[in-house]
C-alpha cells in the first residue's frame, strides 16, 4: 500500500514541537518496562538490568542510555506513534543495554514489555533481529519508512562499521535525498 504524502508536503518543519510528557504517566510506563514478566526467571545480568531500571524509574539512580532509549519508545507508543526497530541483535541490544525482548531461562519463552504499552494504545510495535545483510535490511527499512511517515522506523547497525555494508543505500538513496533534488528525480521520492 502506497502512502499519500500530500498532507506532509509544503509544510514548515521548523515549528516548535511540544515533547513534554506527564511525569506520572512517565513513571507508570517506566514501571511497565522495568517489571520482570510474571513467572519469568531471567539470567542474572538481565535481572540486574531490570532492577537498575526500577531504580532509575524511582529516581534512585541516574538514567542511562538503555533506560532513556526504551522510555523514548514507551512514550511514543503511549501517544499512539508506531515503532519499528530492526538490525542484527536489536532485541537484546549489541551491548546488552536494551533487552526489549527477554527470555525465560526455564522454558525459553519470550516476552516484550513494550508490547503491553503498544497494545494499550492500539498501535504497532515491531522489533526484529535481522540477518547480517546490512544493504538489504537498510534498503527495505528505508522503503518502509517512505510509506509510513507517522511511525518511527529505525535500522541499527550492530557496530558503526557495519554500516559500511549498506553504504550504497546510504549514498544513493538517503544522502542523495538530503543533498539535492536528484532523489526526487531519480527515485520518485517526494518528501
Residue ranges and their predicted role:
Residues 1-80:
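Hard-cation-handling environments
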Residues 178-183:
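Conserved small/polar residues in nucleotide/adenosyl-binding loops
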Residues 82-84:
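Patatin-like phospholipase A catalytic core
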Residues 67-71, 94-177:
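Thiamine diphosphate
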Amino acid at each position: 500500500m502506497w502512502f499519500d504524502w500530500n498532507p506532509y508536503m509544503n509544510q514548515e518543519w521548523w515549528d516548535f514541537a511540544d515533547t513534554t510528557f506527564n511525569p506520572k504517566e512517565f513513571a507508570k510506563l517506566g514501571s511497565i518496562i522495568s517489571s520482570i514478566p510474571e513467572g519469568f526467571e531471567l539470567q542474572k545480568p538481565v535481572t540486574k538490568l531490570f532492577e537498575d531500571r526500577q531504580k532509575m524509574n524511582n529516581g534512585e539512580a541516574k538514567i542511562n542510555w538503555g533506560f532513556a532509549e526504551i522510555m523514548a519508545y514507551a512514550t511514543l507508543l503511549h501517544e499512539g506513534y508506531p515503532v519499528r526497530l530492526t538490525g542484527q541483535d536489536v532485541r537484546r541490544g549489541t551491548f546488552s543495554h536494551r533487552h526489549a525482548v527477554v527470555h525465560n531461562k526455564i522454558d525459553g519463552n519470550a516476552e516484550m514489555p513494550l508490547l503491553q504499552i503498544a497494545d494499550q494504545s492500539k498501535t504497532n510495535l515491531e522489533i526484529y533481529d535481522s540477518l547480517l545483510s546490512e544493504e538489504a535490511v537498510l534498503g527495505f527499512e528505508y522503503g518502509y519508512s517512505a510509506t509510513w511517515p507517522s511511525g518511527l522506523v529505525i535500522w541499527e547497525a550492530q557496530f558503526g562499521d557495519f554500516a559500511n555494508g549498506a553504504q550504497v543505500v546510504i549514498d544513493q538513496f538517503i544522502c542523495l535525498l538530503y543533498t539535492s533534488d536528484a532523489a526526487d528525480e531519480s527515485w520518485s521520492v517526494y518528501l
